[in-house]
Amino acid sequence: MNLISRNTFVSDQDCSLYNRIAWRILPFLFVLYVVAFLDRVNVGFAKLQMAADVGLSDMAFGFGAGVFFLGYCLFEIPSNMMMQRVGARLWIARIMVVWGIISTSMMFVSTPTSFYILRFLLGVAEAGFYPGIVLYLTYWLPSYAQSQGLACLSLGVGFAGVIGGPLSGWIMQTFAGMHGLAGWQWLFLLEGLPAVLLGIVVFFYLDDRPGKVRWLSAAQNAKVVADLDRQRREHEQAGATHTLRSAFRHRALWCLVFVNFALLCGTYGVSFWLPQIIRNLGEQTLLETGLLSAVPFAVGSVCMLLVGKHSDRTRERRWHASLSILAACLGLALSATFHNQPLLCLASLCLAMAGSLSAFNVLWAIPGTLLTGAATGVGIALMTTVGNLGGYASPFMMGWIKQSSGHLEYGLFILAALNLAAALVMARVRSQAGPVAAVGTAG
């Protein structure tokens, strides 16, 4: 079974080689990404119990949920630069162990202030993880195969949403009161420890770069290095940016930064508040809330894979991304419109999540065709750093609106408008983000 479609490659030899690499690294990175997303958004479920225990208002929760991204943004670029210096294996392992410890420590939150501090520190600890993973894939897979690789990883968001909702609801409902701990405290403990354990595994399992890895033959190592070096030269000759100064002057890159910002506003604005949105649709147990919260992520995951495969097969990025963002915009607007009609609201949330997740994995395949060398890592980190400000702004905005008006749907309309702007910007991006030549076609 191929993780990356046969139609993506020029030859059966390339297909076999790069799928062998994909099977080696993608399933493991997928697990890491699932754990990362669970640790990032489980606070949305914890709120259903901890708000009363800790004294969190809707605005305080929104601020605390979003302040994670301030820490994340401040340390994003330094973290990615350190990864290039010390190597992916050591740095990703460090990230996971530290964030797992801090995530577990969330069980000791007792006041809004301690909630803010630990959420900020969690962002600092996790800074560099996703752009580091994206950068790591550029070391192993050619650009024309990266969208499907990113789709496999981004599927971790959907999978985490599918299992995270029911799991979180079950933990909070089942363990509440056990050994004197509240259900939300057990949630942070049981979902934080896996990151620490996996961080240790990372150090022994991942290899920094191709060239001398034991699970490839000498000829295969040499071919991967040659393919990726040739691709780098082709991008440089075609005008891909190499220097840091040029990266910051690249207009298309700043367009991608804005698009990523808008997408993250929508995704995290919904993800952090999804349990509350679902809860408002009718009376449910915590487990039922978790099960219903899983539905949009399940639908989004399927759509993301289909769009990612089609984008790689046609080697087109811009329109796949812009139309997906437009679908997210429509879903957000409809979910606000039908907030009193459970089935229609849930269907609209499915459309919003399908559009967001589909756009993400296509969007993140573009920077590698615009940038090369040191500019690649910094460009990716720039997209994530500025984009993740949306992860701070949207949960706080949703909390402020909820506390001021008593309605979350006004916030959903604002997120829909922002996604509409992003779809229009993405449609105007002119770069190599359209069709890209396959590695191996060059003489």
Regions flagged by a language model, labelled:
Residues 150-172, 194-195, 384-394:
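Glycine-rich segments within core transmembrane alpha-helices of 12-TM secondary carriers
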Residues 55, 87, 108-114, 125, ...:
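Helix-breaking motifs and short loop linkers at transmembrane-helix boundaries and internal kinks
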Residues 75-87, 303-316:
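Helix-to-loop junctions at the C-terminal end of transmembrane segments
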Residues 74-113:
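Conserved MFS/SLC helix-loop-helix module at the cytosolic interface between two early adjacent transmembrane helices
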Residues 43-44, 245-304, 360, 364, ...:
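Extracytoplasmic gate region of multi-pass secondary transporters
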Residues 84-96, 312-325:
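Cytoplasmic membrane-interface "Motif A"-like loop-to-helix N-cap segments
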Residues 317-366:
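C-terminal transmembrane helical hairpin of 12-TM major facilitator-type secondary transporters
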